[in-house]
Regions:
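Acidic (Asp/Glu) and glycine-rich low-complexity loops/linkers
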Residues: 19-117, 121-136, 147-156, 166-173, ...
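Short, surface-exposed interaction patches in beta-rich subdomains
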Residues: 163-243
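Bacterial Sec-dependent N-terminal signal peptides
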Residues: 1-23
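Glycine-centered small-residue hotspots that permit tight backbone geometry or close packing
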Residues: 5, 118, 234-238
């Protein structure tokens, strides 16, 4: 919530200086958003990217499709941000893009994979439907999906990400979580869920048949739906609550 408020205030403050890029792109089914790129997904019949930005040059912004993957990234920050030494006499370092405010409005026709890196937001208010759907997040991102329908949902999160899926249906979910991630997919009804958790995050899920748990650390797991809880390899203090 704090990140959302900060982003809104930043956008309002810098609105007079904000610039825009509009670009039609080739067909894609996957999106990779690199550090500093906030993403808002919109379903449509014409694939395109509308990007608003400030405190960064247009020549430093890259939008391209390779194969079926749309990549949006800043120069020299494809996977991680390039750092520079501050002139504060203490040797501290900061991102070369620390003042950049960037939001990509991406119109998609179909999606089966999302990847986000850094410390930003990814939002999709329209339905996502795919045979299989993969989500990967690295850093401290806020991810909100309104609706997901898929046969198999796989999520791999590293860091302190916050994932929420409001509703949907899937046969099976598989989570691999590293760090203190916060997951709320209790609105996504599933039959089977497999979890591998390393750290102290929280997981709120909904399963009708079985939840398999491997956990290392002290995660909190809340299970709705009446599934059988199968503790496989649990090292540490996993707090499991079943409704």
């Amino acid at each position: 919530m704090l990140k959302t408020l900060t982003l809104i205030l930043s956008c309002l403050t810098l609105s007079a200086f904000s610039q825009e890029i509009n670009k039609d792109v080739k067909h894609f089914t996957r999106i990779v958003a690199s550090p500093r790129i906030n993403v808002i997904l919109e379903k449509g019949d014409h694939e395109a990217v509308r990007l608003t930005y400030s405190n960064v040059g247009a020549e430093q912004i890259n939008i391209d499709v390779t194969g079926k993957t749309l990549r949006i990234y800043l120069e020299d920050a494809r996977k991680v941000e390039r750092m520079k030494r501050q002139r504060d006499g203490h040797g501290n370092r900061e991102s070369v893009y620390h003042n950049a405010v960037i939001t990509a409005y991406v119109t998609y026709k179909e999606l089966d994979m999302l990847e986000i890196r850094g410390n930003q937001e990814l939002t999709c208010k329209d339905p996502l439907e795919a045979e299989t759907f993969t989500l990967r997040a690295y850093g401290e991102n806020e991810i909100h999906l309104a609706s997901l329908r898929t046969g198999f949902f796989k999520a791999k999160l590293y860091g302190e990400n916050d994932l929420r899926i409001d509703k949907g249906r899937t046969l099976e979910q598989k989570f691999m979580l590293y760090g203190e991630n916060k997951i709320d997919t209790k609105g996504l009804r599933s039959d089977y869920i497999i979890t591998s958790i390393f750290g102290e995050g929280s997981l709120m899920i909904n399963s009708a048949e079985e939840v398999r748990i491997d956990a290392f650390g002290e995660p909190r797991i809340y299970v709705d739906g009446g599934a059988n809880i199968n503790k496989r390899l649990v090292i540490g203090k996993a707090n499991i609550f079943a409704n």
